[in-house]
UniProtKB/Swiss-Prot annotation:
Region (ATG8 family proteins-binding): 544-638, 745-756
Gene responsible for this protein: Nbr1
Post-translational modification Phosphothreonine, affected residues: 588
Any one GO BP annotation for this protein: regulation of stress-activated MAPK cascade
Name this protein carries in UniProt: Next to BRCA1 gene 1 protein
Stated role: Ubiquitin-binding autophagy adapter that participates in different processes including host defense or intracellular homeostasis. Possesses a double function during the selective autophagy by acting as a shuttle bringing ubiquitinated proteins to autophagosomes and also by participating in the formation of protein aggregates. Plays a role in the regulation of the innate immune response by modulating type I interferon production and targeting ubiquitinated IRF3 for autophagic degradation.
UniProt subunit comment: Homooligomer and heterooligomer. Interacts with TRIM55. Interacts with titin/TTN. Interacts with RNF29, USP8, MAP1LC3A, MAP1LC3B, MAP1LC3C, GABARAP, GABARAPL1 and GABARAPL2. Binds to ubiquitin and ubiquitinated proteins. Interacts with SQSTM1. Interacts with TAX1BP1. Interacts with IRF3; this interaction mediates autophagic degradation of IRF3. Interacts with IL12A and IL12B.
Binding site for Zn(2+) 1: 219, 222, 242, 245
ZnF (ZZ-type) intervals: 214-266
Amino acid sequence: MEPQVTLNVTFKNETQSFLVSDPENTTWADVEAMVKVSFDLNTIQIKYLDEENEEISINSQGEYEEALKMANIKQGNQLQMQVHEGCHVVDEVLPQTVVEKQATARTGKKPLAHYSSLVRVLGSDMKTTEEPTAEARSPVPCDTDKPQDKPPDWFTSYLEMFREQVVKETVEKLEQRLQEKLVLQKPPFSSSPSEVSMPISEEETLFLPENQFSWHIACSHCQKRIVGVRYQCSLCPSYNICEDCEAGPYSHDTNHILLKFRRPVVISSEPFFYSKYPTPRLPAALEQVRLQKQVDKNFVKAEKQRLRAEKKQRKAEVKELKKQLKLHRKIHLWNSIHGLQSPKSPLGRPESLLQSNTLMLPLQPCAPVMPTLSAAFVDENLPDGTHLQPGTKFIKHWRMKNTGNVKWSADTKLKFMWGNLTLASTEKKDVLVPCLKAGHIGVVSVEFIAPTLEGTYTLHWRLSHKGQQFGPRVWCSIIVDPFPSSESPVNLERDGISSSKADDFTCEQEEAFLLAEEEIPLGEVTKQTEGTGSSAPQKTQHAASERELYIPSVDLLTAQDLLSFELLDINIVQELERVPHNTPVDVTPRMSPLPHDSPLIEKPGLGRIQEESEGAGLKASPDSTVLTKRKAETPASVEETEEDLSGTQFVCETVIRSLTLDAAPDHNPPCRQRSPQRELQLYSTEEQQPLMLPGFCRKDSSLKFALPEEGPHGDEREEIVHIAEEEAIEEEDVQDEEVQSQSSASSEDYIIILPECFDTSRPLGDSMYSSALSQPGLERGAEGEPGIESGQEPAEARERLPERESQPKEQSISDILTTSQHLDTVPLVPEVAGLPAALSRSAPCGQYEAPRVDSPVTIQEVLPVPDHVRGEPRGSTGLANSRQKSCDHSRHHNGSSIAGGLVKGALSVAASAYKALFSGPPVTAQPVISEDQTAALMAHLFEMGFCDRQLNLRLLRKHNHNILQVVTELLQVNNNDWYSHRY
């Protein structure tokens, strides 16, 4: 939009300013008309001053636009204009005719008197039939067509005289005829006494004192006749107000511009008008009458337009009212039919109700309300991506809000749309929803069964009322985990548990996580029999429920639950997260948080322990040395033998053999046999706990709890220890080359050289759990403690428990692995084996030393805790007493083995999980660390690239010389420094 331009117009030392607010829509004709009206001029010539103060004429729209551009650019939106009055071409002989006839210029019709003046101007071009002399003399100027003959002067003067005479006579003739015509039309002016008096009275009213003009128009505001200045709306021609009303308040759109008129035309000098030509009074009266008629015509036309517009508006209002009435009828009809169709009232004829409603509709001015069906999603109980076990029964709840204005009835259902998830009842494609009123919130529930195959499953639903769908689409999306072999029906059936009960137990474990808010009490009765390997099936009593779903409390979960849910997923989560202190998110059931002093850092290659060729020191092929590969190479008969062991018994056997170190290497164990040349045995240091077996990482491996078998005696164990120490010293240099940094990528594989004397036919890590679960005074107390047979009843162990708790320094049985009475397996019974006093007393205390192979561990059944008392986390069901770090036998004499640190790092994740399951709060007792061991740890840290000696020493003291935690914190510090320097 162009800026506003101010026009400073000067005429005879009188200057007026005009503000052109919209130059684009203001034309030159508008400006010229405004100037004429403002200065009371008829013929004008407007000129503007350019930047050199030169006057330039404006006669067209293009010149006017050029002037505006110049004003915008060079004169600051100001345009100086000069107005010059144009010369009249009408002769002074008949000025009164021009004056009177120009009074009708704005009416659109010009009288004959004006054309008579044009005849005088045109001269000989006019040919009148009344003057034969003009016809006779007209051929005379035809001789002037010859360009070579110039007319003489006398001829030219004669023609001018003739022209004036012809024009004068023609005008007089026309005026005479006009006067005769007016006399014949005298009846309209019959109110006047005579022909002469009427024009006089009209003249008196036409020219009032002070040179004011009477418009014979009523003011649109005060309804009086306008005399003098008249203001007419530029947009509404029918709106006219007088000068007094314009000065005060008036009812009209303030945005409309009012045009000011003093008189229709410029009034000439009156004395000359009256003295010389008194006769043209009749034409003046005629013009006044015609003006009034034109004004009346315009007024009538405007009034008709106004009435027409009002009529259209009334029609539109009537149409809108009819539409609203029709809408009211539909609404009442729908409500009446809906009310009659309710089950409480029989269906009747709504004609009478409709008629009564239609009669009363005009009396109800309420706004129309359309019946709308709408819903909004509020909340759900199972978020997308929830992990479930195959065959799990669960119920998905959606909280929905009725956001419409129609109450949900029995016809409102949750309709199945599409999906691949299995319904508990395949016939129920439409689920009933609660009858919610408008604005209320309810719960819509659907029962599902997790498919047997792993994968992601989704099912979509939408609300529907009588076949009309509405509201948002809701869905249930779950992730079905693969069926672990430890819980497969085949293995459980071979252990004496039917496949159906195994599936139910899996479902029950899942329900504890999915529907914990709808817990159903569970009573479990476990029958325990004497013996080392016999177990009775677990008997569960389900509470009465229509859905037959078992929803146990979290506190009722047993060690089997913890092992099957916690340990199986540790390695998988570590591969995904690779962050310390990271707890598995989607693992079910919920677990207590792990201690912060044992972060989850693990290499996924721990399950693939490779073997190095003895002679050349070269690495063997990873595919040929993976433990799981070796299992596949064994004969089918051996596999069948191994499958007799369930997954939980396998884990239990591993843990028990790690704790009860009185068992000798069994060369005919129930698990897979391996050749002596390829036997490997993991070992741990003081902080090392359970090793993550390949079965924990691979979902097709089997885990099974089993009771300990007869082991070697003390002399055999002592011999094994010495052999292991000698070979560890010899191969330390070879292992040093194989050591990987604790902070390296998680995809690395470790190659660990172990002595051949280690029996790998048994579960991995015979003693890896012992050091973390035994007391420092274990060896001292073991000497005087008599052995307890493996078949001892749990009651005897319960009697011994208070005594041991009251005398922690004198007990010979250390921390106890407690298996809840809810397990299907036979309860673990305490078993104590003797140890040579010389060996136990000579064992030096050290945290980073080779693992004990000969420390006795007592397994004891603790008193069962009543269900109503169980409110502590699951970790509290593990050991009765808090653990302390023990003193171990050293495999090397002058420093800790790098291989020991490597194995400790490899077993860190399993240790953390085991501590979370079976240990209490960490003990603050710090073992004595020698300077040589500290120096070895410092050298190990330098090898890893951590060369800040002061920081290393400070972190070693902070973490009790736990190199794993030191490396973890160093990595975190380095990462933080990298981020701070980068950003």
